[in-house]
């Protein structure tokens, strides 16, 4: 067989009968396997030595030839060739079938390839193949068509009438004949002609048929090969038979399946020889067809063939499928030698790059190295005795072990390996005992703890492997998280506590002067004598100046690198991490690692000296709690009475109650924390643990000492009975019972969601695994715009954080001097980002993977910085896999998050008013305002309030000597004018100058506040507003419909009992009128308000509660109906993970919103078509047609007659459908939307993921285009094609003077995109294995082995990192004794450790 390294690509095709014979070494004629007495294979049976090769090395079946001397001799007596027994793994046989059978993959798969070629349905095919109906092959003059089905009677009728001219057949024979008669070229031409004549493609089946025909034409496959005359028999070692103790045999299911085929085939041969009646022969042929079906794909048949114990037998297809199949079990994941696993324990004495390796394990893992060393030192004469010495554990073995292990890195892995930091390399340090010792600071990366976790250890053997392990995987190279570039080695728990204690400060007594010291030694001496404590405030002479600090902080600062600014503040875990990141940035990884070890030592030491413990006395309940709970009870009572009077609905009451308790809980938490902070002078152990970030969170402590709060039901609904006790006071029985709900949900969720997150990661890896950095610069002109992320006016992500690690796509220009500060393609480091921010930019254009035009993978400039090392990415970096891991890994983390808070619900307090936290000026109020009875201005439709920050304001006469002009941008601290008194006036923050009406203003950014219908506005245009002044008030629980005129109400298409339900509340006797869905009737529910000649109509959606009766009088601004907003479910990644999933899978949401297809004016027609309302959009351009929009009756329409909409505006309520965004707004809008939405979910959980990782995945989802017009290209309409392949083909066609194809971009979800990759190996190993392989075989696909997965499957080195193609062509020059004369092969062979080579010789 060929070596697995001497090919670049693999093609898969249908096998012709000749090809199957070529593979075969002989025909299997008997169903026998082995002789049960001699246990030797039967001749001509399924294990026959003559066909498949000898079972014993260098020995024939009868024993005439025994020795390697006779290699290649074929025994004249038994016919067996003398050779290796290994050939039984590769030699195939065959079975000559007495009648052709159809291959199940090609007729039973959806869509059936055979059916498409013959233009028959699967059922029609089945009835021919299973001998139920005849198919016409040559109709003669009968007037019937070829391929039509007829029954037995008709067949005989036609035969009598037309004689031999009329040909029809039954069974696979007939199908084979039909397939052989197909002229693929002519048929394909005919269909293309048909499509062009039809103009628009109506029939999808025609297109599918064309695709299959052209696949056969281009691949060189013949259609009749889908029907088999010969069945190949796979090598016997791949379907083994083994003897169990007790003399029984275990055998592979395939042998049973082959046996059935051979039995039936032999029986059929006998029947044909005996010229048996047709009906018997047909039955046997049908059974043969079923036997072959079962052999190839047993699970696809309705009634699978069962073996012992009623278990379906595993067919060839089942061997490949699923997690236990060949692909995932044996090709993508293998067990490896030189590995071991053991429990881990903490190793506080280790350095960052070390791990403790138990001597017992080391002895076994390094065995060959030890044996070689023993022989080298003449401690053993040969390998065999060295082996005995090692097994006897002699004293000298341990001396040698120390030497062998020294500087030989090993890899540690903790399952589940969710990201690349789950495997890291360390230098082993030999330890006693049986547990592996792990450095405490690497735990976070492995997500390991010491409660019984196990880790696996692997030894890299060859020098090359050791070198890579050393250079790339050693733990000091992995101190940053590849997902975001933050340190992942930060201290946790005890260490944090120790550092916080060391750097905190006791309040100094007033009036007592500070003790002074002249240097660090004096301070140490004073501590030892007990004169000062670590946390006492002192003054000390340090680095040339007097400092007020504490001894603890002085000690901490000694471990920081030289020249680092003095840290004079208490350090929590976040602060410590910030310092680590800063040191990494300024001093590089080497200094950082040394500092980490020092932090570990300090932390442990001072945590031990501080020795905090928690007693029940430390959990202090705030004295104000009783009052707060009392107030809350009163408010709940008030809400109840409002409900009983009918002022509010039950749903509103429920929401109010939940909000009251949420607010109360927050207040209690606050007062409790204040109480804890005061306790013990700020050193209450519970408080310190939370404040330092060592253990526990505000949420958890609130449950210990505040109140447990609201709990959620398993459905995610919040129970309105709040738990008023905490764990310190103890819960009542009822409270305890309510608690169990949430706690149990937490545990169940954890189990389920972990699997979900794992599956999400698997799909992400599959779609993005072939994205590898392939070149330096793809030369694209495209780019994306990145800016500050804000929520309201709070900056969530600064510009510096967002653009960090990217390349600029345009020159960055100083707006004041107009000079280029940073040219295009500058890498944005922290400094560059800061400078850009200081120039006043709030967004800039940067290169992005989304717009990269590399043919394979992405380029360095579009990708930017490698977040794990903060240097530009290098060619060969597998950025796709890193992206997938970065998104998937937190998914799993987050799923486990619910578990720790114990199911306590976290609801958001609903805001009732719009306000901003700064002084502002109202620039505009967009929307329709009407004045109600109380003279308030009310929005009758959706609108917005535009407010601009007012930074400073002066009268112009108060200023002299203006330094700026109207409209100019100014920076913070920039001089804008001087006062008459000569004082300088500077800008307090970046802004824009605005001078008019005698006023000089510096204005900040505009904020647009969207406002819903029914909002009451408290401000006017040009008003100046104060911080937190209510600008507008609204009902947080309901959307409302408002009358715009005074008049009389008329119900239209609203009928009680049909589409209006009368709900009576039993507790209050209040009556609610609720609009319900009406399926059968064409009702268009509306409320009209009539006033004299004018009339306004308002559409009423499903679930609305009607507030007015037919004939009521209403005033402008009155509420006609309310729509309750959905109750807040608990906000948790349980909501989040499915959201990420649906975004990446590009699922269409259930109630998708409708987007305006064009700019224009709305006309609501009032027509109802198929339970949908019809609207029209009239474009501005009168030449264009009006656009028809249909909206389900039940949905609330956001627009009114005569409103102007822009392309892409939402016309009704609902969720955005990504496919609609792509169609209406284009690719860029969709990319931005997807990245933003995914980030939103993770940000809510406080998880940082760099945008570029999400962009890499989104890029893969948008790789395909859909052909709308094939032009002169080889594409078929409606075919999905890779964008790059499409562009190449179009270039080719244009160069030849043809007309190019046209296409639209399409969005594919993860699963679809993975199954549509160019590589069939990658797709087949992902999902739907048989379908992928069927398709690939027919198309004669070639896999160019570009991605990682397909290379792992084949057994090649992956084309990433040091395996990148460009590195393969490098020869190594050695300046030693002329060894460049030797060919490279010899070099390779020498790399095997000597001991292993010798050991294998010794065994032979």
UniProtKB/Swiss-Prot annotation:
Print the keywords alphabetically: DNA-directed RNA polymerase, Magnesium, Metal-binding, Nucleotidyltransferase, Transcription, Transferase, Zinc
Give its E.C. classification number: 2.7.7.6
- Annotated residues that bind Mg(2+) are located at 449, 451, 453
- Location of the region described as Disordered in the Swiss-Prot/TrEMBL record: 1380-1404
Q: Which CDD domains match?
A: RNAP_beta'_C, RNAP_beta'_N
The family classification in the record reads: Belongs to the RNA polymerase beta' chain family.
What catalytic reaction does the record list?
RNA(n) + a ribonucleoside 5'-triphosphate = RNA(n+1) + diphosphate
Q: Which Gene3D superfamilies match?
A: 1.10.132.30, 1.10.150.390, 1.10.1790.20, 1.10.40.90, 2.40.40.20, 2.40.50.100, RNA polymerase II, clamp domain, RNA polymerase Rpb1, domain 3
Q: Which GO terms describe its biological process?
A: DNA-templated transcription
Q: Which SMART domains match?
A: RPOLA_N
Cite a GO CC annotation. Answer: DNA-directed RNA polymerase complex
Q: Tell me which cofactor or cofactors this protein depends on.
A: Mg(2+); Zn(2+)
- Cofactor, how bound (note): Binds 1 Mg(2+) ion per subunit.
By its UniProt entry, which SUPFAM superfamilies does this protein fall under? beta and beta-prime subunits of DNA dependent RNA-polymerase
Biological source species: Leptospira interrogans serogroup Icterohaemorrhagiae serovar Lai (strain 56601)
Residues annotated as binding Zn(2+) 2 are 778, 852, 859, 862
Which residue ranges have biased composition labelled Acidic residues?
A: 1384-1404
In alphabetical order, the GO MF annotations are: DNA binding; DNA-directed RNA polymerase activity; magnesium ion binding; zinc ion binding
Q: HAMAP family from the entry? A: RNApol_bact_RpoC
Assembly behavior? The RNAP catalytic core consists of 2 alpha, 1 beta, 1 beta' and 1 omega subunit. When a sigma factor is associated with the core the holoenzyme is formed, which can initiate transcription.
Q: What is the protein named? A: DNA-directed RNA polymerase subunit beta'
Main EC class of this protein? transferase
Originating gene:
rpoC
Role noted for this protein: DNA-dependent RNA polymerase catalyzes the transcription of DNA into RNA using the four ribonucleoside triphosphates as substrates.
Q: Where, by residue number, does Zn(2+) 1 bind?
A: 60, 62, 75, 78
């Amino acid at each position: 067989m060929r070596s697995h390294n001497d090919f670049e690509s693999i093609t898969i095709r249908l096998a012709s009968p000749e090809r199957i014979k070529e593979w075969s070494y002989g025909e299997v004629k008997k169903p026998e396997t082995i002789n049960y007495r001699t246990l030797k294979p039967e001749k001509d049976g399924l294990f026959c030595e003559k066909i498949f090769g000898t079972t014993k090395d260098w020995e024939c079946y009868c024993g005439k030839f025994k020795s390697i001397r006779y290699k290649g001799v074929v025994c004249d007596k038994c016919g067996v060739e003398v050779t290796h027994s290994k050939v039984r793994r590769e030699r195939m046989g065959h079975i000559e079938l007495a009648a052709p059978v159809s291959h199940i993959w090609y007729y039973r798969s959806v869509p059936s390839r055979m059916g498409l070629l013959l233009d028959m349905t699967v059922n029609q095919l089945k009835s021919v193949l299973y001998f139920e109906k005849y198919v016409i092959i040559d109709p003669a003059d009968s007037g019937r068509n070829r391929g039509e089905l007829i029954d037995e009677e008709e067949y005989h009728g036609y035969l009598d009438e037309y004689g031999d001219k009329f040909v029809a057949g039954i069974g696979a024979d007939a199908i084979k004949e039909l397939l052989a008669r197909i002229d693929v070229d002519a048929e394909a031409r005919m269909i293309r002609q048909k499509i062009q004549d039809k103009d628009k493609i109506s029939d999808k089946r025609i297109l599918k048929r064309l695709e299959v025909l052209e696949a056969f034409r281009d691949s060189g496959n013949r259609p009749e090969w889908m029907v088999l005359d010969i069945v190949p028999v796979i090598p016997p070692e791949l379907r083994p038979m083994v003897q169990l103790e007790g003399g029984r045999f275990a055998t592979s299911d395939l042998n049973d399946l082959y046996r059935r085929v051979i039995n039936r085939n032999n029986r059929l041969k006998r029947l044909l020889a005996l010229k048996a009646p047709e009906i018997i022969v047909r039955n046997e042929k049908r059974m043969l067809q079923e036997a072959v079906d079962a052999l190839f794909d047993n699970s696809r048949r309705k009634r699978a063939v069962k073996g012992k114990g009623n278990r379906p037998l595993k067919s060839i297809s089942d061997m490949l499928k699923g997690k236990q199949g060949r692909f995932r079990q044996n090709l993508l994941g293998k067990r490896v030698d030189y590995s071991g696993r053991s429990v881990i324990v903490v190793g506080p004495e280790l350095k960052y790059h070390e791990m403790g390796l138990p001597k017992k394990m080391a002895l076994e893992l390094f065995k060959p190295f030890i044996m070689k060393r023993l022989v080298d030192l003449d401690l053993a004469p040969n390998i065999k005795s060295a082996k005995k010495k090692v097994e006897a554990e002699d004293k000298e073995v341990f001396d040698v072990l120390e030497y062998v292990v020294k500087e030989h890195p090993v890899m540690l892995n903790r399952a589940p390996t969710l990201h690349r930091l789950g495997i890291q390399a360390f230098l082993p340090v030999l330890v006693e005992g049986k547990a592996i010792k792990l450095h405490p600071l690497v735990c976070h990366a492995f997500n390991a703890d010491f409660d019984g976790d196990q880790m696996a250890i692997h030894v890299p053997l060859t020098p090359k492997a050791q070198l890579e392990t050393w250079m790339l995987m050693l733990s000091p190279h992995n101190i940053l998280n590849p997902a975001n570039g933050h340190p992942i080695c930060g201290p946790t728990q005890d260490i944090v506590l120790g550092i916080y204690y060391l750097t905190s400060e006791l309040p100094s007594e007033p009036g007592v002067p500070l003790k002074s010291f002249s240097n660090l030694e004096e301070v140490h001496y004073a501590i030892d004598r007990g004169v000062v404590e670590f946390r006492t405030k002192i003054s000390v002479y340090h680095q040339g100046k007097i400092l007020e600090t504490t001894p603890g902080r002085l000690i901490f600062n000694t471990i920081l690198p030289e020249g680092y600014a003095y840290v004079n503040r208490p350090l929590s875990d976040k602060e410590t991490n910030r310092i680590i990141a800063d040191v990494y940035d300024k001093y590089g990884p080497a200094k950082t690692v040394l500092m980490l070890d020092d932090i570990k030592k300090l932390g442990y030491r001072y945590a031990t000296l501080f020795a905090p413990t928690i007693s029940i006395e430390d959990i202090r309940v705030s004295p104000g709690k009783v009052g707060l709970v009392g107030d809350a009870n009163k408010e709940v009572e008030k809400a109840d009475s409002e409900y009983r009077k009918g002022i509010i609905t039950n749903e509103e009451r429920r929401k109010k109650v939940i909000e009251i308790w949420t607010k109360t809980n927050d207040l209690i938490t606050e007062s409790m924390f204040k109480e804890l902070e005061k306790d013990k002078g700020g050193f209450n152990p519970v408080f310190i643990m939370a404040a330092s970030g060592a253990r526990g969170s505000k949420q958890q402590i609130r449950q210990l000492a505040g109140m447990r709060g609201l709990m959620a039901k398993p459905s995610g609904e919040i129970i309105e009975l709040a738990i008023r006790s905490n764990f310190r006071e103890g819960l009542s029985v009822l409270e305890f019972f309510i608690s169990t709900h949430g706690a149990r949900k937490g545990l169940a969720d954890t189990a389920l969601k972990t699997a979900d997150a794992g599956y999400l990661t698997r799909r992400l890896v599959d779609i993005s695994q072939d994205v590898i950095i392939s070149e330096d610069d793809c030369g694209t002109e495209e780019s994306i715009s990145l800016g500050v992320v804000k929520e309201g006016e709070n900056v969530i992500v600064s510009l510096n954080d967002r653009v960090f690690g990217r390349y600029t796509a345009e020159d960055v220009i100083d707006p004041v001097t107009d000079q280029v500060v940073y040219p295009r393609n500058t890498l944005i480091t922290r400094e560059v980002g800061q400078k850009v921010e200081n120039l006043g930019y709030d967004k800039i254009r940067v290169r992005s993977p989304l717009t990269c035009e590399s043919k394979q993978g992405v380029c360095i400039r579009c990708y930017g910085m490698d977040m794990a090392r903060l240097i530009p990415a290098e060619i060969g970096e597998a950025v796709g896999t890193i992206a997938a891991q970065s998104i998937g890994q937190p998914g799993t983390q987050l799923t486990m998050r619910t578990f720790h808070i114990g199911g306590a619900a976290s609801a958001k307090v609903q805001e009732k008013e719009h306000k901003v936290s700064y002084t502002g000026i109202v620039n505009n109020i967009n929307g329709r305002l009407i004045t109600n009875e109380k003279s308030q201005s009310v929005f009758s439709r959706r609108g917005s309030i535009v407010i601009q920050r007012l930074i400073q304001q002066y009268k112009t006469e108060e200023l002299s000597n203006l330094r700026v002009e109207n409209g100019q941008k100014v920076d913070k601290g920039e001089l804008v004018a001087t006062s008459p008194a000569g004082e300088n006036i500077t800008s307090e923050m970046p802004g824009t100058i605005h001078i008019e009406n005698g006023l000089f203003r510096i204005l900040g950014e505009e904020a647009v506040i969207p406002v819903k219908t029914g909002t009451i506005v408290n401000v006017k245009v040009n008003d100046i507003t104060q911080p937190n002044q209510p600008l507008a008030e609204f009902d947080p629980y309901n959307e409302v419909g408002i009358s715009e005129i005074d008049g009389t109400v008329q119900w239209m298409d609203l009928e009680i009992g049909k589409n209006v339900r009368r709900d009576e509340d039993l507790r209050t006797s209040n009556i609610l009128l609720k609009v319900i869905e009406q399926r059968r009737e064409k009702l268009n529910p509306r409320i009209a308000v009539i006033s004299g000649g004018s009339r306004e109509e308002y559409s009423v959606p499903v679930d609305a509660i009607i507030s007015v009766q037919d004939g009521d009088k209403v005033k402008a601004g009155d509420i006609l109906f309310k729509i309750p907003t959905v109750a807040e479910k608990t906000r948790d990644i349980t909501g989040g993970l499915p959201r990420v999933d649906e975004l990446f899978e590009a699922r269409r949401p259930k109630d998708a919103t409708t987007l305006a297809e064009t700019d224009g004016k709305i006309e609501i027609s009032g027509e109802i078509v198929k339970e949908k309302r019809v609207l029209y959009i009239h474009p501005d351009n009168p030449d264009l047609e009006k656009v028809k929009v249909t909206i389900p009756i039940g949905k609330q329409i956001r627009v009114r007659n005569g409103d102007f909409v822009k392309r892409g505006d939402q016309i009704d309520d609902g969720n955005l459908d990504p496919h609609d965004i792509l169609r209406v707004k284009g690719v860029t809008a969709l990319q931005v939307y997807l990245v933003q939405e995914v980030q939103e979910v993770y940000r809510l959980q406080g998880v940082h993921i760099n945008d570029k990782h999400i962009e890499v995945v989104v890029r893969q989802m948008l790789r395909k285009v859909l052909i709308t017009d094939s032009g002169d290209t080889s594409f078929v309409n409606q075919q999905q094609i890779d964008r790059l392949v499409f562009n190449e083909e179009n270039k080719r066609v244009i160069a030849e003077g043809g007309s190019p194809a046209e296409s639209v971009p399409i969005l594919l979800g993860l699963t679809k995109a993975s199954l549509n990759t160019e590589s069939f190996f990658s797709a087949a190993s992902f999902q739907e294995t048989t379908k992928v392989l069927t398709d690939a075989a027919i198309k004669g696909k070639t896999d160019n082995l570009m991605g990682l997965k397909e290379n792992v499957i084949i057994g090649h080195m992956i084309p990433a990192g040091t395996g990148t193609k460009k590195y393969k062509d490098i020869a190594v020059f050695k300046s030693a004794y002329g060894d460049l004369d030797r060919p490279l092969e010899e070099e390779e062979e020498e790399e095997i450790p000597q001991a292993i080579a010798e050991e294998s010789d010794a065994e032979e």
